[in-house]
Swiss-Prot record:
Residues 830-1085 are annotated as: Helicase. Pfam families: RdRP_2 (PF00978), Viral_helicase1 (PF01443), Vmethyltransf (PF01660). Keywords: ATP-binding, Helicase, Host-virus interaction, Hydrolase, Inhibition of host innate immune response by virus, Nucleotide-binding, Nucleotidyltransferase, RNA suppression of termination, RNA-directed RNA polymerase, Suppressor of RNA silencing, Transferase, Viral immunoevasion, Viral RNA replication. Residues 72-281 form the Alphavirus-like MT domain. Residues 801-963 form the (+)RNA virus helicase ATP-binding domain. Residues 50-441 are annotated as: Methyltransferase. This protein is translated as a fusion protein by episodic readthrough of a termination codon. When readthrough of the terminator codon TGA occurs between the codons for Gln-1116 and Gln-1118, this results in the addition of the RdRp region to the replicase. Belongs to the ssRNA positive-strand viruses RNA-directed RNA polymerase family. It comes from Tomato mosaic virus (strain S-1). One of its GO terms (molecular function) is RNA helicase activity. InterPro entries: (+)RNA_virus_helicase_core_dom, Alphavirus-like_MT_dom, DNA/RNA_pol_sf, P-loop_NTPase, RNA-dep_RNA_pol_alsuvir, RNA-dir_pol_PSvirus, Virgaviridae_RdRp. This is Replicase large subunit.
């Protein structure tokens, strides 16, 4: 052991001494590698050739000053000021290094030849000829270019490639390369450039006035300007000559003229303004506009050249804190008292920020001046007695050392000689340990005598002042002043005989008869002080004139003093009062006196309230005998009508509206609307009606239909106005690039806060500065909408493009008599014809254009009829006898003819029945022919919440004629028509096979280049139409828009992969789409749907059978199971039998083909192959496109083959695909919805349907915020979550509209066959930070608890943390003897379909439960326009609304939305049982209940792609609910259980055991086999191919209950 320790110590000592050869070799190798790396790095620097002859010292100067370049000194060119000229090239390259390559750059006064030689084709040089020298310099640059080109030509060489673009640009467009205008007036255009713009100024800013520099940069949209200029700190002293030793140049100053020249050279001098240069040095901010400013920042000083940059700053982006709108009256009065003091100080304020205010900045940017002070030196001529003064920079430490020492001298020792001796001694040497080492202070020896005199004089005067302060007395016959002069004369001897006169002239002393006052001057000033004084002497400091403002403030102060006598005057809103006086141009004192008179009841006007609260104002302004000012009142009937002139004089305008019986107090007198101008500036509130659903119509059916039509117009207008008002209230400054269907114009800035997709809107809603809302008829000029001074914002929407509803209401109002419409006695004949039966042809053959009228719904159809009628060349069909319905209603009475003999209405069944009745009445005809198709698209009520009863949809006619022979449709389509119409449908077409379909791989594959479409292009939805138009297709329409049209060839396109309710086998839209063509129709779709099935069926019909159209329908029967026992479930233990093959067989029978998929490498394939994606606006960080590789750990291999996938690795592509297929794939199906009013009605139904009657009102004594609620929330959180809140101070709210985005690594298995044709997207999670959850989590937890406590739990189950046993108890009292309909609402894209309407419904529910208004508004804004950031994948995007899958209200919010949706559509008062959970629902209704069109209601109101299924057994949250005669049992879905057994993410055997236990818990009910037969029936309802499955249920129980046996379902992946 001792030997080992000795050997180790010896080796260590050898290593330390450097005798270890191995260590030495390693060290040398390491040193060599480091040197190689360093030299390689240096070799990569930009190369600069220095051709001018310079000395070795100058070579070292250039190399040290610019280490960024690899400089090669050739010394081949003699020139004047060689170093400065060579450095200029380095300075230019250094400036250009700061600019991104290729960005448009302005070189102010630059050398365009240098840029051409470097190949910079993106630089424009502004080279004005300010003097003769500039012309000479420019010609020299041109000569250098000619010389270069001649050399190339002489050597038969071409311009190098890197220079070619620049030289071509100079040859073709020299004005793009260089101009001779000043930078302020440069006319260079930037039309084709969209990036950031830069500028450089190399020794050229001297000639640009500093006050114009910022504006000039902004004019060119410059982002950053880099500048370089010569300067010296000594220029700020009183010296008139300053040397720049490094470049052998000098500055000479004469007043404001500053001259620059090179020493010992005959070159011309450069002359500039000293004060202008001083501004560039001292100022920090250079204003460019009232919003933007350029901020200067010094970069570096190199070889007497100063580098800086000017950055563009938008001051509107400064953080301004939280806006405070309240008014503190005490502070206002106090401010008024101090007004004159403020006036005095504000007048002296400087509007510029200069670096002089910060001494640390001065020291930093003038590093040589850090420890220097400026000391004055004096000299006097003996001949002329003229004093001269100059200043020098001296180290502060040197000055204090001298002063502190000589201050200790006794009076006899304080002589000039002693001071000079001491100064010379400390300047000459420093003694260290008795040895002379060096001089500590480097002070010029030529200054020592003058400095010594200054120090001596200062101390002498300071001593005299101290003595005079101690005592004032006379000494003998001489006064104190005489003694002082004696002392001074003795000190200076005869050298300065006139020192007394000099001191008096210098104002250092003040003498009277017997007294002497001495003012000791400052020995020195700091560099900072001199810089400040010099700048203020050279620059006129701006003064702020606030006299006018102070006068206005004085007037306002007097007015407020007048108002102070009012009661509660401290709550008076001063801001609103001031704005009112300014907008109305009213004197504040006059307005104040009027207000005092009104409030004191001295004006003749009596107000019924003491305080102007909202309730009191509403009470005072309620309708009595007069309408409010500007009101457009909706009335049900006329009363005694006064004259229209009197109504207009009062600013009233009444509109015939909801015609049903409602309380009479809701309405006022009704006037006739004579022109559209009466709508202008009517108050928006008068057009918004909230009682659409409580209407009772009276009279004959036709009269009721006509009243309903008028009311529908009012409801449509009300919804449009209401939504526009809501938009104005909700809109803040939104991203200007965002385009929406609606638009909001900011009047002050003339910019769209939200850009609308349409233009030239006819009307809109205006928000005034007084926050009032009015409907305005808009006018336009070349600049846009013409606005008024008191308008603040204008909102428009697609409904406001034309005057349609307004003009129709005006016309129909004139037709009413005593509030009742008149019904025509004309005969009405309905011509019911199949598609293509020749309805239009028949109309043209029967019509007499001279006395008849043709009306059609659309403009295209009207043009087609005119074109066909005038085909012979004789014009018979005009705009007077062939018109659209809208045109006829809007312009009634304006044409030449008002009465017609016969009326022909084409596609009349697409119109409101009341509209048809009005058309018959208005035409004054004897007979009316209404052509239509009872099976095609009927009238669709697009105003959600407005009642359109089913019996109103039936048109009352006198006679019905049928047309069952189609002249258009081919034979295969006729075969389909026979399934839809009564009677035999025949065709005349020779075409037999005309329809076909093509499945496309995705929406992105349909574009005009790769997929040109034949014939007319049709879509089912507006979103698909807009998508095709945006990709370049033309003449695209929806099926609804072309009803009644005929085309030879049709291409029908569906791009929406999610379910669309109107695409169904019995849908009228499908019928219309199949019957538009005469030759061919091809259907392009991205998914399988009913239309594909229809087309495939038609393709299989035999040609010889196409004339046989009979279809037999089978009878549906339902098996009834009688009851045996009651009250509890019969239990029969499940035998444990079966094998793995049983589970595999059952899975393959239910989902054939899924188990054969080899999808382990689908994710890899997607990453490695080319992929084309259509995305919405988002920001992608492409550095995250390749995920960091991770070691793949082996997982267990399942023996059961299912469609389960391997866990995927998150990354840019994977996350983006998930975002596209989920967040970016939201449907747009909803119609016109009056959001606020409809939401209020829906919530009324929610509370009436689900809540106990005694708990429908919120508990006011209930506190949402309490320690208990917070503790309950914390108890549910993990420890990691609590740790994230450690640094949260809860002082302010975090950004509630900011969300993070992530995906689940494991794809969700679908129990269908979609996995065989598509790559399933991962589930996305959009979530808040824990800080936000800590605020809103306890809040919504308490609200949820309060809601669940109020639910009628005997009838409704809100599935929140319920066990299967509790579900069984809930459904256990169902009586199987009572016939029931089991309903399930299946909603596709549930989260992503939720829009503004869903948010309004949910917020209204929370509000009624007691949510505080402020937090409710915060939560609302946090779910309106939101920003998503995925830091893992590098994705950032913006979403409007949508349900966030990770915030605190995700689950309960989805639950209340699905419950609200069903309550608004189904008769919940008849419901037996109902359960809701997220997007799942299960409802039990009595057999035979009538249900509305759920698909249409879900589409138009809720934007849901929904289907309502009637079943025998319920399916709820992955479980089958089996009700029987004893009660109810809940079975977990066995197919879902088998799918989970194919999981490929099990890590190890311990993970497998946890997996088994979780499956045992959810599948516990399978241990009871008593109701396996009913379970088979329930599974068979969902999966049609499922066999009886008791054998597989037993097998599942067998493997799940045995830990060892369950391990046999998996293999160890590490051993495979």
């Amino acid at each position: 052991m001792a030997y080992t320790q000795t050997a180790t110590s010896s080796a260590l000592l050898e290593t330390i001494r450097g005798n270890n050869t191995l260590v030495n070799d390693l060290a040398k190798r390491r040193l060599y590698d480091t040197a190689v790396d360093e030299f390689n790095a240096r070799d990569r620097r930009p190369k600069v050739n220095f051709s001018k002859v310079v000395s070795e010292e100058q070579t070292l100067i250039a190399t040290k000053a610019y280490p960024e370049f690899q400089i090669t000194f050739y010394n081949t060119q003699n020139a004047v000021h060689s170093l400065a000229g060579g450095l200029r090239s380095l300075e230019l390259e250094y400036l250009m290094m700061q600019i991104p390559y290729g960005s448009l750059t302005y070189d102010i006064g630059g050398n365009f030849a240098s840029h051409l030689f470097k190949g910079r084709a993106y630089v424009h040089c502004c080279m004005p000829n300010l003097d003769v020298r500039d012309i000479m310099r420019h010609e020299g640059q041109k000569d250098s270019i000619e010389l270069y080109l001649s050399r190339l030509e002489r050597g038969n060489k071409h311009v190098p490639n890197f220079q070619k673009e620049a030289f071509d640009r100079y040859a073709e467009m020299p004005n793009e390369v260089v101009c001779h205008d000043t930078f302020q007036t440069c006319g260079h255009s930037q039309e084709c450039y969209t990036g950031r713009v830069y500028a450089i100024a190399l020794h050229s800013i001297y000639d640009i006035p500093a006050d114009e520099f910022g504006a000039a940069l902004l004019r060119k949209n410059v982002h950053v300007c880099y500048a370089a200029f010569h300067f010296s700190e000594n220029l700020l002293l009183e010296d008139s000559h300053v040397n720049l030793d490094e470049i052998n140049a000098c500055f000479q100053r004469d007043g404001d003229r500053l001259t620059f020249s090179f020493a010992s050279e005959s070159t011309l001098n450069y002359s500039h303004s000293y004060s202008n240069i001083l501004k560039y040095v001292c100022k920090t901010y250079f204003p460019a506009s009232n919003r933007e400013v350029y901020m200067k920042e010094f970069l570096v000083t190199r070889v007497n050249t100063w580098f800086c940059k000017f950055s563009r700053i938008d001051t509107f982006l400064l953080y301004k804190g939280v806006a405070h709108k309240g008014v503190d009256s005490e502070q206002f009065y106090k401010a008024m008292e101090d007004a004159w003091h403020y006036k005095k100080t504000l007048a002296m304020c400087n509007s510029e920020r200069i670096l002089l205010e910060d001494s640390s900045s001065v020291n930093y940017w003038f590093p040589k001046m850090r420890d220097m002070v400026i000391v004055p030196l004096f000299d006097i001529s003996l001949e002329t007695s003229k004093r001269t003064r100059k200043e020098v920079l001296v180290l502060k430490d040197f000055v204090y050392t001298v002063l502190n020492h000589i201050r200790t001298y006794q009076a006899k020792a304080l002589t000039y000689s002693n001071v000079l001796s001491f100064v010379e001694s400390i300047r000459s040497r420093v003694i260290i340990n008795g040895v002379t080492a060096r001089s500590e202070w480097d002070v010029d020896k030529s200054l020592l005598q003058s400095l010594s005199m200054t120090f001596f004089l200062h101390i002498k005067l300071a001593v005299l002042k101290d003595d005079l302060l101690i005592s004032k007395f006379a000494l003998g016959p001489k006064t104190v002043s005489q003694h002082v002069w004696d002392e001074i004369s003795l000190a200076f001897g005869n050298a300065f005989p006139s020192i007394k006169e000099r001191l008096i002239n210098r104002k250092l002393i003040k003498i009277t008869e017997n007294a002497l006052e001495i003012r000791v001057p400052d020995l020195y000033v700091t560099f900072h002080d001199r810089l400040v004084s010099e700048y203020k002497m050279s620059v006129d400091m701006p003064v702020l004139d606030i006299r006018k403002k102070m006068e206005e403030t004085e007037e306002m102060y007097n007015a407020l003093s007048e108002l102070s006598v009012l009661k509660n005057s401290d709550k008076f809103d001063v801001d609103v009062f001031s704005q009112m006086c300014q907008s109305l141009e009213v004197d504040p004192m006059t307005a104040a006196k009027v207000i005092v008179a009104v409030m004191s009841n001295e004006s003749g006007l009596t107000l019924t309230f003491e305080q102007p609260t909202e309730a009191n104002v509403a009470l005072a302004l309620q309708d009595s005998e007069k309408a409010s000012d500007g009101a457009l009142v909706v009335t049900s009937r006329d009363v005694e009508e006064p004259s229209i002139k009197g109504s207009m004089a009062r600013g009233e305008l009444q509109l015939a509206g909801l015609s049903g019986d409602v309380p009479e107090s809701s309405y006022t007198r009704s006037e006739e609307i004579e022109s559209l101008e009466q709508f202008h500036m009517a108050t928006a509130s008068s057009l918004i009606h909230k009682q659409m659903c409580s209407i009772v119509y009276t009279g004959p059916l036709k009269v009721q239909q006509m009243k309903n039509f008028i009311d529908s117009l009012v409801a449509s207008l009300s919804a449009a106005v209401s939504n526009l008002v809501k938009i104005l209230k909700d809109t803040a400054a939104i991203d200007l690039e965002t385009r929406q269907k609606f638009g909001v114009l900011d009047v002050a800035s003339k910019r769209w806060l939200v850009k609308p997709s349409a233009k030239n809107h006819a009307w809109g809603v205006v928000e005034t500065h007084a926050r009032k809302y009015h409907v305005a008829l808009l006018e336009h000029d070349e600049f846009g909408i013409i606005t008024c001074d008191n308008w603040r914002r204008v909102a428009v929407s697609p409904e406001s493009v034309v005057y349609s509803d307004m003009a129709k209401l005006r016309t129909l109002r004139r037709l009413l008599k005593d509030g009742e419409p008149h019904v025509s006695s004309a005969k009405v004949v309905l011509v019911d014809g199949v598609p293509g039966c020749g309805k239009t042809k028949e109309i043209l053959s029967r019509v007499n254009f001279e006395e008849d009228l043709i009306l059609v719904p659309g403009r295209q159809a009207a043009e087609m009829i005119r074109r066909r009628a005038n085909a012979s060349g004789i014009i018979v069909a005009t705009k007077d006898n062939v018109r659209t319905v809208d045109s006829f209603l809007m312009n009634y009475g304006k044409g030449a003819r008002c009465q017609f003999k016969r009326l022909f209405i084409d596609e009349g069944l697409m119109l409101h029945t009341g509209c048809v009745n009005f058309l018959v009445e208005m035409s004054l005809s004897d007979i009316a022919y209404v052509y239509g198709d009872t099976q095609q698209i009927p009238y669709i009520n697009r105003v959600t919440g407005f009642p359109y009863p089913a019996h109103f949809a039936k048109l009352e006619v006198d006679e019905v004629e049928t047309r069952r022979t189609t002249l258009r449709c081919p034979a295969d389509v006729t075969h389909f028509l026979n399934q839809r119409y009564e009677g035999h449908v025949m065709c005349t077409s020779s075409e037999k096979k005309s329809v076909s379909q093509e499945m496309v791989s995705g929406a992105a594959s349909i574009n005009p280049v790769s997929k040109p479409l034949k014939g007319k292009i049709l879509t089912f939805t507006q979103s698909d139409k807009e998508a095709l138009l945006s990709r370049g297709y033309t003449d695209v329409h929806t099926v609804h828009e072309v009803q009644g049209e005929t085309y030879a060839d049709v291409s029908l396109v569906r791009l929406t992969p999610t379910p669309v309710s109107i695409i169904a086998r019995d849908s009228p839209h499908v019928l219309v789409s199949l019957s538009r063509h005469t030759k061919s129709l091809k259907y392009y779709t991205v998914v399988m749907d009913p239309l594909v099935s229809i087309i495939r069926d038609l393709e299989r019909v035999s040609s010889y059978l196409l004339d046989m159209y009979k279809v037999d329908a089978g009878t549906q029967x339902q098996l009834q199971v009688d009851s045996v026992f009651k009250n509890f479930n019969l239990f029969v233990a499940t035998p444990k039998t079966g094998d793995i093959s049983d589970m595999q067989f059952y899975y393959d029978k239910c989902l054939p083909g899924n188990s054969t998929l080899l999808n382990n490498y689908d994710a890899v394939t997607m990453k490695l192959t080319d992929i084309s994606l259509n995305v919405k606006d988002c920001i992608l960080d492409m550095s995250k496109s390749v995920a960091a590789p991770k070691d793949a750990k082996p997982t267990l291999i399942p023996m059961v083959r299912t469609a389960a996938e391997m866990p995927r690795q998150t990354g840019l592509l994977e996350n983006l695909v998930a975002m596209i297929k989920r967040n970016f794939n939201s449907p747009e199906l909803s119609g016109v919805v009056d959001i606020e009013n409809t939401a209020s009605l829906v919530v009324d139904k929610f509370f009436d349907s689900y809540l106990l009657k005694e708990k429908r009102k919120p508990n006011k004594n209930f506190s949402l915020f309490s320690r208990e609620s917070l503790n309950r929330w914390i108890a549910k959180q993990e420890q990691v979550t609590i740790g994230q809140l450690a640094d949260f101070d809860f002082v302010d709210l975090p950004a509630v509209d900011q969300y993070r985005h992530m995906i689940k690594a494991q794809p969700k298995q679908k129990l269908d066959l979609s996995i065989q044709t598509e790559y399933p997207a991962l589930q996305t999670i959009v979530y808040h930070s824990k800080k936000i959850n800590a605020i809103f989590g306890p809040l919504f937890s308490e609200l949820t608890r309060q809601l669940l406590d109020s639910i009628d739990s005997s009838r409704f189950l809100f599935f929140t943390r319920k066990t299967p046993a509790q579900i069984e108890d809930f459904f256990g009292d169902l009586d199987s003897h009572v016939p029931m309909d089991v309903l399930e609402l299946d909603v596709s894209k549930y989260d992503k379909s939720q829009n503004e309407f869903h948010c309004a419904v949910e917020y209204e529910i929370w509000r009624r439960l007691g949510l505080e208004d402020f937090l409710a508004e915060v939560w609302k804004q946090g779910h309106r326009k939101t920003t998503l950031k995925d830091y893992t994948a590098g994705i950032k995007t913006c979403l409007w609304y949508q349900r966030k899958s990770g915030d605190v209200t995700t689950f309960i919010g989805n639950t209340v939305i699905i419950a609200s949706c069903l309550a608004s559509m189904l008769p919940m008062e008849k419901l037996i049982k109902g359960a809701f959970c997220g997007d799942d629902s299960l409802l039990y209704f009595p057999k035979g209940c009538e249900y509305p069109d759920i698909q249409q209601a879900a589409n138009l109101m809720w934007n849901f792609e929904a289907k309502l299924f009637k079943k025998q057994y319920g399916y709820f949250c992955g479980r089958y609910v089996i009700h029987h005669d004893r009660g109810c049992i809940v079975y977990y879905d066995p197919l879902k259980l088998i799918s989970k057994l194919g999981a490929k993410h099990i890590k190890d055997w311990d993970h497998l055991e946890e997996f088994r236990r979780s499956l045992c818990n959810v599948a516990e009910s399978l241990n009871n086999c008593a109701y396996y037969t009913q379970l088979d029936d329930a599974v068979g309802e969902v999966h049609k191919t499922a066999p009886p499955g008791s054998f597989v249920y037993k097998s599942l129980v067998k493997y799940l209950s045995d830990k060892v046996l369950f391990r046999s379902l998996f293999l160890d992946g590490s051993s495979c």
